[in-house]
């Protein structure tokens, strides 16, 4: 009888030690390793073993990360990467093994430790849900009364070089921009579209756009500058 009791106690001890409970009331804004507590799955790179150029990630280097779950819980993770192609967040566990976050995330902020620059991404499935918009991670390029979001499209292309038995893979990155204004998310294809979308300041934006054209700024730079300028007019 004593033997059975000992076995039962051992089993209960093993079960208890294998479970990791996160106190929801105490997690917001605190510990740095909470992704470990909620678990994930190991990352196995079998998809891009023949990749010669391009990347499925927003940036290849590991960055500091902080994320909000779909349930509204703030998680601060140590080191993460954002996989744009598969809409996954990768992190390093305590043994520095690459893992995939297993819980739905609403948004994530990546910080480059070398430059100090931060990148805030919103998941359209949980952050703001618009039926006509492609699902995935959108980079917030400007915020305020009008928001500007950048959407990256990763396309995998395969090519077999002449006299080669191996097929090479290339990932090409395309991008789209969207303006969030008065609860409407509208795609903007060129800077000239911005004054038409943010029409209450149309005249001011058109004058500012001419200045940007004279400076020969890129389309993406002009879009960010125009939306930022619009928001400053409302302050």
Name these PLM-found stretches.
Residues 196-235:
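Long, compositionally biased interface segments
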